[in-house]
Design a protein with these regions (language model features):
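A non-catalytic, helix-rich entry segment at domain boundaries
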Residues: 51-56, 180-256, 433, 442
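Conserved small/polar residues in nucleotide/adenosyl-binding loops
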Residues: 1-5, 566-572
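Mg2+/Mn2+-dependent nuclease catalytic core
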Residues: 77-107, 251-357
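Conserved ASCE P-loop ATPase motor domains encompassing nucleic-acid-directed helicases/translocases
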Residues: 51-120, 431-568
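Extended, Lys/Arg-rich, non-catalytic nucleic-acid recognition/anchoring regions
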Residues: 246, 316-318, 324, 329-395, ...
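Charged, low-complexity interaction regions that mediate assembly/partner binding
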Residues: 16-77, 363-496
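Long, charged low-complexity segments
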Residues: 3-17
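Charged, glycine-rich intrinsically disordered N-terminal tails and low-complexity linkers that flank
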Residues: 87-89, 95-212
């Protein structure tokens, strides 16, 4: 215990533990404690004070970092005026020790979300989570993919960004498996495999035609054999496993590919399958699980487990669902294996610390806008840095290391002028991305994707960035070829119909938007399921929204519930 927490045992704590062990042995073997040992044992027990008793608890606080010392972070709240900085206790064992690296990277005026905050009688804050720059949303899948076989360094995130996306068989197989799941979930009877494959060819014609692997006869045959295997396994899972005792999965009340924006944790993501009441969800994987960790047993890979944990955390902090009551499953369609995920909040804290380190790197690059600094950061993308677990041997040298070395080899082959151009372009894109997410601090008002939750409803209405209190006139969300909704605008509550025309929206045909159900003033994109789409057409009487994904469960978008949509500026 002392080694794990990197603490040296004090004499009184050591004697306390010795006393506990001595009395345990006495009870177990019914033998008296030796006299010389008994005289050394304390008469009263010392206790570890992990954190002072809580006077009150706060679910979430947004604060601005000022400075720190060895014990406290000194912060000011954003929603009220404080005469003195608040003191935040950090690096507390078993509470928030996972954020030690985050606290080392903080800069003056950095914004933090403090979650699950315990406030003692002296007013000191002890949060369970410290989220750096929460307005900068990271994609859950991209963050989880930082967990590799060889380690989880933040540079893995930037390596994935700089590597080209290959149109390979595994990616195609995953897309087709998602199509199979959609078909089996909404099928009333049997599903024809050949019809599904024809639909796959209509949906992914370019990808299938351009896939280099499918030009090889043997690989092509294996690919379509795999498609049939995954089709059969998904059928078995939906028709049989869903109804097995303990799973409580009802395909008739399911939502496919729901999206969530979690400002609390600085994350966004999209699930494969979820019950409409959010009691259960499934993340599907068409690739291999870990077949070698335990002999004769298939275990989920670490990156997949991380992804599940983050979804559980998002449902808790965005939707108010207790993670202990949400059943999360990983579906490996290759076996098939429907694996129940077990929540570990300590692991979630470690992943959020990794997220914070990535955001700090992004902030540093866009702030300095320096070719030398960017070159230094990208120099971290090398095997000696990323191989945190010290792997060696044939698997590392043949399959893992080449993809890392390939980046540095290509970078080193550039001329000095080409490198300067690359670093300058990288800086430009990073700054634009940062601004598009978090907004421009020099701009009056809220900008970027963060304005979705930072701007008030009145501010959005004034700038024409939202249209709300819409009604669904026609629901064609299940249309395979053109999933869309026809919305009818009406006057906002409390506004006479003749004055509704005074509200001028700032929307045009083709604009990317995010749609969500809005039944009260408290509803927004951070606490409701969101649907992404584009404006197909709009006029004074109706608005047509083209959805990015079909949604065959009509109860997800009820016709009697008002909806709102606002501009979507998230990179997607």
């Amino acid at each position: 215990v002392y080694k794990r927490q990197q603490q040296e045992p004090t004499r009184e704590h050591l004697l306390r533990d010795a006393k506990t062990l001595a009395f345990f042995i006495r009870k177990l073997f019914e033998e008296d404690i030796p006299q010389e040992l008994y005289q050394l044992l304390p008469r009263t027990d010392a206790t570890y004070i992990v954190a002072p008793p809580a006077h009150k608890r706060v679910q979430r606080m947004r604060v601005c970092f000022q400075y720190s010392d060895e014990q406290y972070l000194y912060v000011t709240p954003l929603d009220e005026i404080a005469d003195e900085p608040l003191r935040v206790r950090y690096n507390i064992p078993q509470i928030n020790e996972e954020f030690a690296e985050t606290c080392r990277l903080l800069w003056r005026h950095a914004q933090l979300n403090l979650l699950d905050v315990s406030v003692d009688e002296a007013g000191f804050l002890t949060p369970s989570f410290i989220v750096l720059e929460p307005d900068y949303l990271l994609d859950i899948s991209s963050l989880a993919e930082c967990y590799r076989d060889y380690g989880h360094h933040p540079a893995n995130y930037f390596l994935s960004r700089l590597q080209p996306i290959e149109n390979a068989r595994p990616l195609l197989l995953g897309n087709i498996a998602n199509l199979f799941l959609d078909e089996w979930i909404h099928a009333e009877g049997e599903v024809d495999y050949l019809k599904c494959m024809r639909k796959a060819f209509r949906r992914y014609p370019i990808e299938l035609a351009a896939c280099a692997d499918l030009r090889d006869r043997e690989k092509e045959r294996q690919f379509f054999d795999d498609c049939k295997l995954h089709f059969d396994h998904i059928r078995e899972t939906v028709n049989d496993t869903f109804h097995a005792a303990g799973y409580e999965l009802d395909k008739t009340d399911a939502v496919l590919e729901p999206s969530y924006i979690c400002e609390a944790l600085g994350l966004q993501g999209r699930l494969d399958y979820m019950q409409r009441d959010m009691s259960s969800f499934i993340e599907m994987k068409s690739g291999k699980a870990d077949e070698y960790a335990i002999r004769g047993k298939v275990e989920p890979k670490e990156n997949n487990k991380v992804q599940m944990l983050l979804y559980q955390a998002v449902l808790q902090y965005s939707m108010g669902m207790d993670h202990r009551k949400v059943k999360a499953y990983l579906l490996y369609t290759r076996y098939p294996l429907l694996y129940p995920s077990r929540p570990s909040w300590a692991m979630v804290r470690r992943v959020i610390d990794l997220r914070n380190r990535i955001v700090a790197d992004e902030y540093g690059v866009q702030l300095r806008n320096s070719l030398e600094y960017t070159a230094q950061k990208l120099e971290e993308i090398k095997a000696s840095v990323l191989n945190e677990r010290g792997l060696s041997g044939r698997f590392w040298e043949t399959y893992l290391r080449p993809s890392i070395d390939n980046f540095q080899e290509k970078l080193s082959s550039l001329s000095s002028l080409e490198k300067s151009y690359f670093y300058a372009l990288y800086n430009f894109i990073t700054k634009e991305l940062y601004t598009s997410k978090s907004g421009d601090v020099d701009y009056e008002g809220c900008t970027g994707a963060a304005s979705l939750w930072l701007s008030t409803l009145a501010e959005k209405c004034e700038s024409g960035e939202i249209i709300y209190d819409l009604r669904i006139k026609e629901n064609h969300a299940a249309d395979e070829h053109k999933a869309h909704l026809l919305l009818v605008p009406s006057a906002p509550p409390g506004m006479p119909a003749e004055d509704a025309s005074d509200v001028l929206p700032n929307f045009r045909q083709g604009d990317a938007i995010v749609l969500y159900e809005r039944n009260s003033d408290a509803d927004n994109v951070t606490n409701k399921m969101v649907f992404k789409g584009n404006i197909d057409f709009l006029n004074e009487n109706e608005i047509c929204i083209r959805l990015r994904a079909t949604q065959q469960n009509s109860s997800v978008l009820p016709s009697d519930s008002p909806v709102s949509y606002t501009h979507l500026t998230l990179p997607t």
